Amino acid sequence: MNRSRQVTCVAWVRCGVAKETPDKVELSKEEVKRLIAEAKEKLQEEGGSDEQETGNPSEDGMQSARTQARPREPLEDGDPEDDRTLDDDELAEYDLDKYDEEGDPDAETLGESLLGLTVYGSNDQDPYVTLKDTEQYEREDFLIKPSDNLIVCGRAEQDQCNLEVHVYNQEEDSFYVHHDILLSAYPLSVEWLNFDPSPDDSTGNYIAVGNMTPVIEVWDLDIVDSLEPVFTLGSKLSKKKKKKGKKNSSADGHTDAVLDLSWNKLVRNVLASASADNTVILWDMSLGKPAASLAVHTDKVQTLQFHPFEAQTLISGSYDKSVALYDCRSPEESHRMWRFSGQIERVTWNHFSPCHFLASTDDGFVYNLDARSDKPIFTLNAHNDEISGLDLSSQIKGCLVTASADKYVKIWDILGDRPSLVHSRDMKMGVLFCSSCCPDLPFIYAFGGQKEGLRVWDISTVSSVNEAFGRRERLVLGNARTSSISGPFGNRSSETPMES
């Protein structure tokens, strides 16, 4: 598959979160040497020290380079005269034979006419220059306004993988790449979080990245040109350990790729990760270590999400065609399972109906479930292929958007538990890998796929969407409730929406 413009995962950052003027990294020679040394050490630890034949440049190639770089030699005396000079006819045609003659004395008055001109120090000071130069535009684009959203996407290029940080501003109709971050491995999932592990208990603007390795990287979005993450969770197994068959313990982290991430907004130091090693790990980011490892699935865990209002409640979906619901205070004893017709691709909580969640499968179905019941509320045959995007509008109740490997995005009205198709569109992006709704703008969605990079679509521009949802009340979620927490998860004294 061509990787030239693949976008594999995407996440939004709310307005007003990012630093207005991001910091730029300026490394000293000593820091560069340290980073190079650490990179070499990691390669050696992973058993990647096998030398590759690079070869020296061939003498013919070096000779060719020298030939191209050699200055042109003067022509020999025996060369014909017309190869070195223009003939008289050409001189006459362009009046070049009089080029060195002094000009008309009347032309000296031109200098007098310039005496009245005003010279400005820069174009900013000249009132007649209304067009801004490139540097001014670059300076303005570098600043992040309070009305700007950030969109962070994982991108797989032909020869490298990176994070792209885009700026989106609906009011100004602007959308551009602000900066990018070079990644060490193929990105599979991204999750925004504001937890800062530093002792001062401040908040930050971070993005956690799951990739084809067991290591989760956490990057600071307020720093441009950074070469290493702020911190990492987990570690890679060296080739020597893999050959010995030594399995990494849950105390160290995952042993395979990290397929999905979910940050707990109520217990801010907790991050959940789903892995191809069949486990879910709850990370205590304040310690940089796993707090718990959940092993209830029998195949790769592809998706998971914390409940938006209940800190201890988590759902996960797996290749084993099941969804698990956990109480993270005692996950092994307190969990519930549902079985489905296909592998689970995505799960998401319905933030308008806290007892309900949605699950999508690789055979094109969407299931709406009540966490207190065994049977689904409805089953929707939504697509002809796996459903990789499953996103409820951030503010419009009943507005569901699905994205699929069948190349289509579909918009559904599921209000009243009777789903109806509102609009369907071929995005011309090939296989669709991911989607996400803007937290501040309920009709703005971002999509990533096999080609055409990152796409942002305002679905309200579709007349049928306007008819279905245009007059529907917008429900803005308030701040989540918090309570004092003694450990990774604390007992909550108040009654929870998940309780019947």
UniProtKB/Swiss-Prot annotation:
- InterPro entries of this UniProt entry? G-protein_beta_WD-40_rep, PWP1, WD40/YVTN_repeat-like_dom_sf, WD40_repeat_CS, WD40_repeat_dom_sf, WD40_rpt
Name the Pfam families on file: WD40 (PF00400)
Superkingdom to which the source organism belongs? Eukaryota
At what positions is Phosphoserine found?
A: 49, 58, 484, 493
Main localization, broad class: nucleus
WD-type repeats, residues: 185-229, 253-293, 296-336, 382-422, 427-467
Q: Nuclease: is it a keyword of this entry?
A: no
Give the multimer and partner information: Associates with the RNA polymerase (Pol I) complex. Interacts with POLR1E.
**What is the recorded name of this protein?**
Periodic tryptophan protein 1 homolog
Organism of this sequence: Bos taurus
